[in-house]
């Protein structure tokens, strides 16, 4: 095909991303340093935040306080929460995609406090990313089991003070009953279905992670049915005063450990919102640590079909 064809072939292969490994991002198998392996031999920091201010009352958050928080938007409207794992990967709940599983229907908003940015908020729209792939755990069964999914973004995220990845670990044992765990989201704010009021800012709540024995005991009152498996855990207040609600699904539950933040759970399901003896139920990320790492390590960018057609034409050209 000649020197010119060979050059075009090399450029097309680079543009299509053929053979390029998926970015591993902010993963680790256990306690360690604050830097994690990233794509292309680079190292990336995770679990850091530069904004520490907290709005009085601990209900409404501040921009940049949770820089890994993502708003998953279905046809431009907030639908679920998520968390940034690396420049190309976002973690969320599988049940968010039960009826809407085409990547083209979704975008991911990062770095914004509000779930409804105004049309003239150019900063917000510059930090909105298209979704290339939605990878639901193959064993997902609604919201009850294996409620976890990964989104591969169509382009790389630019990090700044308001956009940073979260760390994850292969064990959550050390986080049970720790005082500094938080859940964030843009969901309803009362059991009666009160929506988030303007300016639709992210809300945060400090929660305690319960062990599964205690959680099953609470769910067995007044019935005698255990509902919490090892792939889940409960968090919140036993009196129902702190809980997640509709619209928070897929969002992160994170804990501080030695100055680094780790995502421990994904908002999954609950019995209504804010009910006594019915704490919120979360996907236990540690159970899926190796699945997450495998998907992120082995996925490759999807080539542009037009580029592949041109590539074939070059290969067959005299």
Curated annotation (Swiss-Prot):
Concerning InterPro entries, the annotation shows: Peptidase_S1_PA, Peptidase_S1_PA_chymotrypsin, Peptidase_S1A, Trypsin_dom, TRYPSIN_HIS, TRYPSIN_SER
Q: What is its main location?
A: membrane
Primary enzyme class: hydrolase
Gene Ontology biological-process entries: proteolysis
The UniProt entry, under Gene3D superfamilies, shows:
Trypsin-like serine proteases
PTM note says: N-glycosylated.
Q: Where is the active site?
A: 95 (charge relay system), 147 (charge relay system), 249 (charge relay system)
Q: Which UniProt keywords apply?
A: Cell membrane, Disulfide bond, Glycoprotein, GPI-anchor, Hydrolase, Lipoprotein, Membrane, Protease, Serine protease, Signal
Recorded protein name is: Serine protease 41
Q: Which organism is it from?
A: Homo sapiens (Human)
């Amino acid at each position: 095909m000649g020197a010119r064809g060979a050059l075009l072939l090399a450029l097309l292969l680079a543009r299509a991303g053929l053979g390029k490994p998926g970015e591993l991002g902010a993963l680790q198998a256990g306690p360690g340093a604050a830097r994690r392996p990233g794509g292309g031999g680079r190292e990336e920091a995770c679990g850091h935040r530069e904004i520490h201010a907290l709005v009085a009352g601990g209900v409404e958050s501040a921009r940049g306080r949770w820089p890994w928080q993502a708003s998953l938007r279905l046809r431009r409207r907030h639908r679920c929460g998520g968390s940034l794992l690396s420049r190309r990967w976002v973690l969320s709940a599988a049940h968010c995609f039960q009826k809407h599983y085409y990547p083209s229907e979704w975008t991911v908003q990062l770095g914004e406090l509000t779930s409804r940015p105004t049309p003239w908020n150019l900063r917000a729209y510059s930090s909105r990313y298209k979704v290339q792939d939605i990878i639901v755990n193959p064993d997902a069964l609604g919201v009850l089991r294996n409620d976890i999914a990964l989104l591969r973004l169509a382009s790389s995220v630019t990090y700044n003070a308001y956009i940073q990845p979260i760390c994850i670990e292969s064990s959550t044992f050390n986080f049970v009953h720790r005082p500094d765990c938080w859940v964030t989201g843009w969901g309803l704010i009362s059991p009666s279905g009160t929506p988030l009021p303007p300016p639709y800012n992210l809300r945060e709540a400090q929660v305690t992670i319960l062990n599964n024995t205690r959680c099953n005991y609470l769910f067995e009152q007044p019935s005698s049915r255990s509902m919490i498996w090892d792939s889940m855990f409960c968090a919140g207040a036993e009196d129902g005063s702190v809980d997640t609600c509709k619209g928070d699904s897929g969002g992160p539950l994170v804990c501080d450990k030695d100055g680094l933040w780790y995502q421990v759970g994904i908002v999954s399901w609950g019995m209504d919102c804010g009910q006594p003896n019915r704490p919120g139920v979360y996907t236990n990320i540690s159970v899926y640590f190796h699945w997450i790492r495998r998907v992120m390590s082995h996925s490759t960018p999807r080539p542009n079909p037009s580029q592949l057609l041109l590539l074939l034409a070059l290969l067959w050209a005299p």
